[in-house]
Structure formats: structure tokens, C-alpha cells
Amino acid sequence: MSAKIGVITFPGTLDDVDAARAARIAGAEVISLWHADEDLKGVDAVVVPGGFSYGDYLRTGAISALAPVMQSVIEQAGKGMPVLGICNGFQILTEARLLPGALTRNKGLHFHCVDAHLVVENNTTAWTNTLEKGQQILIPAKHGEGRFQADAETIAQLEGEGRVVFRYTDNFNGSVNDIAGITNETGRIVGLMPHPEHAVEKLTGPSIDGLELFLSAVGTIAA
């Protein structure tokens, strides 16, 4: 039986179609989830994709974190369901308190659209276990509010527990400690600002490195 991966759509979501395609290429059955859904339809994992949900009003991700679908995601994540937050999805996961820290305006206050080189720091999560620790991957990034920040105690905890998953080699947005992605205590929830779903096919991406995150999830579900 194929892994069932749910992909959420909020008003203002942009990258749900690409995330769904990436999951399908990885061999998953994709289930579309609407922001007003309370029923997760039996999915094994959830992707919270990028975009500008609710127009980024109040704060990026703040309104989406209160949506009915996210209340169900929070409940199931507490039971171990793998969750991936990409860009705006990462922002939503921090607002929902599924991940610590906050994503704030980039240094220089500019929107950046670049192909980002990342170093894999943790390859034991549900979304990175087909990668190698220390491996460099290339996936696109596009955001104006992707500067990861947290208090010193939280940063020390993330570093000490090995919960930094990805680091930028060229820290264009000013994130603390070059952090591009993190995980929770269990390694089942991962958030990152760059877009792995845009790097799954040679025709359209700078690489196919992003596909590994979806393959990892499919393998985790099957295990």
C-alpha cells in the first residue's frame, strides 16, 4: 500500500501543486487537504507547503496556525505523524509551536530568490534519512521573511541536541548560526525555508536533491 501524504492548501498557498507532484514522484498517494478540513482523511504524513497564506497578514503563518486543519495536524503530530513545513509552512509550524523559534525579515529587508546550497547536519529525521550527514544539496529558496531567530537558550538546545537539520553555506538571509532547517525532539517534524519540491526533476530544478526528503518520508512510513 502506498504511503498517503496530505498536502494542505490555505488561501494564498502557492506551492501545494509542486509539493503534491514531488510526493507523487517519490511514490506516495497524495491527499489534498483544505484549510477548513478537520478530518485528515487517514494520511500518514503531512506537508505544509509554501506561499503567502492569508496574505501574510498579522504575521507570516500566524492565521494559518489557527486553521481547523492545523489543529488536527497538531494533534496527530503529537502522536508521531511526520510533518514537513516548507517556507511559509515552516513559519506556520513555528506559529503553531510545533517547532521553536521564529522566521523574521531577511537581513537587508530584501526578498531573495536564489538556488541555495545547504549542508545536511542531521540525517536521522523522518524527512532526511536517505541523505548523508555533511552532504551538500542544492535547492531553490524564495522568501522575504526567512531569517531564523530564537533566544540563546533555544539555539543552544537545538545545537546541543543535534536538531539543526540544514545550514546555509551562503547565509543570505541572516539566520542565526546559518540555520536553514530544524527538527523537533523526535525527528518527525521538520521545517526548512528552501523549497525541496522545486528540486525533484532535472527539467525544472537546479538539481533533484529535494526529492530525497520525500523519498525519506515514504521510506519512514513504510518501515
UniProtKB/Swiss-Prot annotation:
Molecular function terms, GO-annotated: ATP binding; glutaminase activity; phosphoribosylformylglycinamidine synthase activity
Keywords: ATP-binding, Cytoplasm, Glutamine amidotransferase, Hydrolase, Ligase, Nucleotide-binding, Purine biosynthesis
Glutamine amidotransferase type-1 domain ranges (all copies): 4-223
Subcellular location: Cytoplasm
Pathway involvement of the protein, from the record: Purine metabolism; IMP biosynthesis via de novo pathway; 5-amino-1-(5-phospho-D-ribosyl)imidazole from N(2)-formyl-N(1)-(5-phospho-D-ribosyl)glycinamide: step 1/2
GO CC list: cytoplasm
GO biological process: 'de novo' IMP biosynthetic process
Name the record gives this protein: Phosphoribosylformylglycinamidine synthase subunit PurQ
Gene (UniProt): purQ
